[in-house]
From Swiss-Prot:
<comment type="similarity">
    <text>Belongs to the connexin family. Alpha-type (group II) subfamily.</text>
</comment>
<feature type="modified residue" description="Phosphoserine; by PKC/PRKCG and PKC/PRKCD">
    <location>
        <position position="368"/>
    </location>
</feature>
<keyword id="KW-0007">Acetylation</keyword>
<feature type="modified residue" description="Phosphotyrosine">
    <location>
        <position position="247"/>
    </location>
</feature>
<feature type="topological domain" description="Extracellular">
    <location>
        <begin position="177"/>
        <end position="207"/>
    </location>
</feature>
<feature type="modified residue" description="Phosphoserine">
    <location>
        <position position="306"/>
    </location>
</feature>
<keyword id="KW-1003">Cell membrane</keyword>
<feature type="modified residue" description="Phosphoserine">
    <location>
        <position position="255"/>
    </location>
</feature>
<keyword id="KW-0597">Phosphoprotein</keyword>
<feature type="region of interest" description="Interaction with NOV">
    <location>
        <begin position="244"/>
        <end position="382"/>
    </location>
</feature>
<feature type="cross-link" description="Glycyl lysine isopeptide (Lys-Gly) (interchain with G-Cter in SUMO)">
    <location>
        <position position="237"/>
    </location>
</feature>
<dbReference type="GO" id="GO:0005922">
    <property type="term" value="C:connexin complex"/>
</dbReference>
<dbReference type="GO" id="GO:0046849">
    <property type="term" value="P:bone remodeling"/>
</dbReference>
<feature type="modified residue" description="Phosphothreonine">
    <location>
        <position position="275"/>
    </location>
</feature>
<feature type="modified residue" description="Phosphoserine">
    <location>
        <position position="365"/>
    </location>
</feature>
<keyword id="KW-0256">Endoplasmic reticulum</keyword>
<feature type="modified residue" description="Phosphoserine; by CK1">
    <location>
        <position position="328"/>
    </location>
</feature>
Amino acid sequence: MGGWSALAKLLGKVQAYSPAGGKVWLSVLFIFRILLLGTAVESAWGDEQSAFRCNTQQPGCENVCYDKSFPISHVRFWVLQIIFVSVPTLLYLAHVFYVMRKEEKLNKKEEELKVAQTDGANVDMHLKQIEIKKFKYGIEEHGKVKMRGGLLRTYIISILFKSVFEVAFLLIQWYIYGFSLSAVYTCKREPCPHQVDCFLSRPTEKTIFIIFMLVVSLVSLALNIIELFYVFFKGVKDRVKGQSDPYHATTGPLSPSKDCGSPEYAYFNGCSSPTAPLSPMSPPGYKLVTGDRNNSSCRNYNKQASEQNWANYSAEQNRMGQAGSTISNSHAQPFDFPDDNQNSKKLAAGHELQPLAIVDQRPSSRASSRASSRPRPDDLEI
């Protein structure tokens, strides 16, 4: 049982990295094969050669008849079967250990690169390559190993080989022994002088164990087939799911389009707010405060808003009847767009704007014409 415990320990490690079907298969292997073979079956076949008797006194006849009837013992045959069907699983375990070793190396290298990154080194490309390698090996966060890529192929190959070995050993057992034991075996072989009859001990008990091991082999084969289909359809499902939404998995959701002409966009995205027009009651020397227009995305917006504000101000002056008034130099506001090389315009302080006059369509009376010819003290010189 010492050898069985070592094999069971190795297979127990595989169970931590196997899907549901693989865990069920390992449970069947442990309980109904290894445990049963190590306890009941060995005791049932313990006296198989010593209890094999033939009705002859010829020396060596019993040995050659036993060798003809049982080329290999059932117990040793089942031991070979368990070893062969476990080897692909152990190869998968070796691949898992290889991936875990790679994970340790990649994590160590990633920590070194992050330390270098804190010192100011540009290691973004190397970190991205490490992430790609982790995805290739199927390594996820918290040390979890996901079955994909080479690991998935190794697991599928192990299932195929286990199924092939199960079928092969069932066929070999059927060819050598059949699936039942007889109580009497007829033997005619040298050095037996004639045809002799040989008798087997406990044939019914041994037949029951043979049928039981046959059923366990069929169950294991069925579990392998189910697991193979499950892994295949799961891989197809994951691939279809990855192809159906590839953009959101890489770049994330799209951001809404931004209207640079809206005041909300100008405020929340770093654009300067449109310049308010001068009020008619603005004191002399009052200057408008403009924001920073280095943001190229809002330059056109600020320019159009400023022109519109001055047009609105002109209309307001005309409506209020302030004809002939001019805007003093102190009211002039420079508008500078330093980043616009082609369409840059600047209203320098000291440049007079054209007077905004209201056109009166009514005919002037004679009194008003005479009154208008007299100078008044509050008239402004132009």
